[in-house]
Structures are given as structure tokens and as C-alpha cells.
Curated annotation (Swiss-Prot):
Main localization of the protein described in the UniProt heading: cytoplasm
Enzyme Commission (EC) number: 6.1.1.20
The record's free-text note on cofactor binding: Binds 2 magnesium ions per tetramer.
Localisation per UniProt entry: Cytoplasm
Protein name in the entry: Phenylalanine--tRNA ligase alpha subunit
Broad enzyme group: ligase
Family: Belongs to the class-II aminoacyl-tRNA synthetase family. Phe-tRNA synthetase alpha subunit type 1 subfamily.
PANTHER family, A to Z: PHENYLALANINE--TRNA LIGASE, MITOCHONDRIAL, PHENYLALANYL-TRNA SYNTHETASE
Recorded superkingdom: Bacteria
Gene from which this protein is expressed: pheS
Length: 352
């Protein structure tokens, strides 16, 4: 009887102590006091040896019930203290959602990206397919398939980064055209645009870089004429530099086209009167083009008596420099935020 009363007193006092615990440390102390190895509830079990055998099961069950009650109350108090602590923390860290937020710095498209996408959008609208290719290319596709055999003197026009005797960093995106035509097994039409990085052994200066971007276009079909090329280039010039632009074709030489032309656009700054941009000529050179050489068609498996085509190639770097008044090509590749941030204002105004 005395042990039962002691058990009830321990239980009652434990519940009082649990409710008075104001923090996790105090609650842990209560747990040790009653449920630890030397705790009060643990001590009750030591008296079991003094009881008759028939009373031991009932007594043990009562002690376990007291232990379970205390454990349950400790857990409940633990959760309550945790909620109170969280509530207090939220009050202390309360955020005034009515305060104006900090503006997130927003970037803008790189001027080269803007120029490339503008050109791609135009030709996608004309039904061209955008095709990518290898930057590490075979000598055959970079030169021989484009009417530049190993003995051709025009190879001296392009100093190249060779990796092996037959592998090099491509010097133009024309290999994409050669590979695409080859895959068509002599069946037209072919209508592709090939943007990408190219590499040449140039000394870096304001107008030259060992790595730069290039976009080339190719159309192969029956009855393709020089007038088709001219109309396409006129549309490109107006898209890039304004509706009042005119183009001029000058005879030139490229091994992979015949006839070949250099393409000039009327100066968008002085309207043809002469200025520092056009070097007082009224015209600005923007790209090279021509009719696809019959040898190139034949090497790709096309019948040059049935199919004709035109090709053109331009440097988005140069076009972007002209459009945005940039005097040094190296600005495109140095990642200077001061330079790049200027184009955020251009983008905000919705300008191309």
C-alpha cells in the first residue's frame, strides 16, 4: 500500500515538474530526474524484489503505466515548447511585406547573340533550316570538298589551326554545307543557314580575332539564279540596317563559288554621302557570296547540269560592330560588364 501511495506521489509531482519546465533544458532535467538510471520511477522497480511473487506482475504494470504517462506528458510539453519557440522566432523575424522589394539585376542579351538571332529569325521565316556542325573538322570537308585541293594556292588565304595533318579547327562554317549536301544524296532542294564559331591564326587586334562567329547560307535547287541571291541579300540588308538600304555587288573570287561577289550596303549613317564609317565611299562591305561552284555540287553528289545554287557568308561580329558603333571586336569576348550593360537599355527600348 505504501509503495502504491509513493508511486502516485511521484506521478503527481512529475506532472507538476513537467508543466513548470520553461525550456528544453529544464524539461530534459525532469526526464532525467524521473526516468533516468537513478530516477524516481526507475527506483520504484527496485522495490519489486521485496514484494510477494503474486503481487509483482500488477506492481510492474503500474510502474510501467506511470512511466508511459510521464513519457507522454514530456513529449507533449516538448512539442508545446517547440511551438512557442517557433512562434516567438516568427515574431522576432517578422517581415513587413508592405516594404518595397529590392530590384533584381536583370541582364541583357549579348550583342552578338542579338545579331545572330535576328539573322536566324529572318531566314527561318524564309523557310531555311538552321544546321550546326563540328568545330573540329576534317581537312577534306574544310577545304577539298569546297574546291580547295591540297595544291590549291587559295589555301594560303587562310592560316589554320591544325591538330593533325588531316584534322583542324574549322576556318569557316562552309563544311556544314558540304556535309549537308553529301547527306542529301544528290536530291534537292537544300536550304540551310549555318551559324557557328570559326578559328584562324590571326593576331588579335581591333578588327581581327583568332576566334570569331560566322553565318553562312546555302540554297541548292533547280533553276536557282543570281537574281535569287541578289533578292535574298537585299532583304537581309533591309532587315539589318533599315528599309531604305541598297546593296551593291562587286566581282570577287572565292574557290567555292563562281561567279563570286563582295556585297556592300549603302551607308546607314551618312546615307551614301560619305563619312568615317564608310571611309567616305558611301558603301560598307558586309559579306561575300556567289553561285555554288559546279565542282562543289559534283563532289557532294549533285548533278551540276540539273542543280544550281547560291551561297553567302557573313561575320555577325562585323555586322554587330556596324549596327552598334563598336570599334573593337575584342569587346565581344572580354566579358566586361560595363560594355555589356549598355545593351540592356537598347533591349528595354525594344530596338533591334
Amino acid at each position: 500500500m505504501a509503495q502504491t501511495e509513493a508511486m502516485a506521489e511521484i506521478k503527481q509531482q512529475a506532472l507538476v515538474d513537467i508543466n513548470e519546465a520553461q525550456n528544453e533544458k529544464a524539461l530534459q532535467d525532469v526526464k532525467v530526474k524521473y526516468l533516468g538510471k537513478k530516477g524516481s520511477v526507475t527506483g520504484l522497480m527496485k522495490h519489486m524484489k521485496d514484494l510477494p511473487n503474486e503481487e509483482k506482475p500488477a506492481y510492474g504494470q503500474q510502474v510501467n503505466e506511470v512511466r508511459q504517462t510521464i513519457e507522454k506528458e514530456i513529449q507533449a510539453r516538448h512539442e508545446l515548447l517547440g511551438n512557442e519557440q517557433l512562434e516567438q522566432q516568427l515574431k522576432e523575424e517578422k517581415i513587413d511585406v508592405t516594404l518595397p522589394s529590392r530590384k533584381i539585376a536583370i541582364g541583357a542579351k549579348h550583342p552578338l547573340t542579338r545579331t545572330i538571332e535576328e539573322i536566324e529569325d529572318l531566314f527561318l521565316g524564309l523557310g531555311y533550316e538552321i544546321v550546326d556542325g563540328f568545330e573540329v573538322e576534317q581537312d577534306y570537308y574544310n577545304f577539298e570538298a569546297l574546291n580547295l585541293p591540297k595544291s590549291h594556292p587559295a589555301r594560303d588565304m587562310q592560316d589554320s589551326f591544325y591538330i593533325t595533318d588531316e584534322i583542324l579547327m574549322r576556318t569557316h562554317t562552309s563544311p556544314v554545307q558540304a556535309r549537308t549536301m553529301e547527306k542529301r544524296n544528290g536530291e534537292g532542294p537544300v536550304k540551310i543557314l549555318c551559324p557557328g564559331k570559326v578559328y584562324r591564326r590571326d593576331s588579335d587586334d581591333a578588327t581581327h580575332s583568332h576566334q570569331f562567329t560566322q553565318i553562312e547560307g546555302l540554297v541548292v535547287d533547280e533553276n536557282i539564279k543570281m537574281s535569287d541571291l541578289k533578292g535574298t541579300l537585299e532583304l537581309l540588308a533591309k532587315q539589318l540596317f533599315g528599309e531604305d538600304r541598297e546593296i551593291r555587288l562587286r566581282p570577287s573570287y572565292f574557290p567555292f563559288t563562281e561567279p563570286s561577289v563582295e556585297v556592300d550596303v549603302s551607308c546607314f549613317k551618312c546615307k551614301g554621302e560619305g563619312c568615317n564609317v564608310c571611309k567616305h565611299t558611301g558603301w560598307i562591305e558586309i559579306l561575300g557570296a556567289g553561285m555554288v561552284h559546279p565542282n562543289v555540287l559534283e563532289m557532294a553528289g549533285f548533278d551540276s547540269n540539273k542543280y544550281t545554287g547560291f551561297a553567302f557568308g557573313m561575320g555577325p561580329d562585323r555586322i554587330a560592330m556596324l549596327k552598334y558603333g563598336i570599334e573593337d571586336i575584342r569587346h565581344f569576348y572580354t566579358n566586361d560588364v560595363r560594355f555589356l550593360s549598355q545593351f540592356k537599355a537598347v533591349e528595354d527600348r525594344g530596338e533591334k
